[in-house]
From Swiss-Prot:
SUPFAM superfamilies: HMG-box. Its main location: nucleus. This is High mobility group protein B4. One of its GO terms (molecular function) is DNA binding, bending. It comes from Homo sapiens (Human). It is found in: Nucleus; Chromosome. The gene is HMGB4. Keywords: Chromosome, DNA-binding, Nucleus, Repeat. Residues 77-98 are annotated as: Disordered.
Amino acid sequence: MGKEIQLKPKANVSSYVHFLLNYRNKFKEQQPNTYVGFKEFSRKCSEKWRSISKHEKAKYEALAKLDKARYQEEMMNYVGKRKKRRKRDPQEPRRPPSSFLLFCQDHYAQLKRENPNWSVVQVAKATGKMWSTATDLEKHPYEQRVALLRAKYFEELELYRKQCNARKKYRMSARNRCRGKRVRQS
């Protein structure tokens, strides 16, 4: 009466893989007691694949198209596992941006004004090139800003963690009071 476990559909395979499977079965029928190593067998298959006519290849390509259609149909009906995302505490301080991100923030508007028809991706590529060609002297102000922001972040994080610990202690002491136990004050 529980939920049915739905397995992910088997991926579609190419025309060459269909040929390979067919060729392997024929080879086993013709020479059942012969062992051929993977490398040698792969070489034989690729030679045979190159030598067959387009008419024969069309048969395998049709199989591959059918397999692809089957896979796409199954994927439309497939409902995979939902990944649970960790809920972020809104009170938790956000990490500071990197020196590169600060550089991008400063230069984005300028590049957009100069090139209004550029997409966000094109502007990002341009700022990336500007950053990689910038000298250490040009990068230094951004690195200083990052150092200040990082110091501020760690102070806020320390304060946040103290507040979280205080809330946890309060919750624990409230539970203990409900149970009739004494709580040690520290």
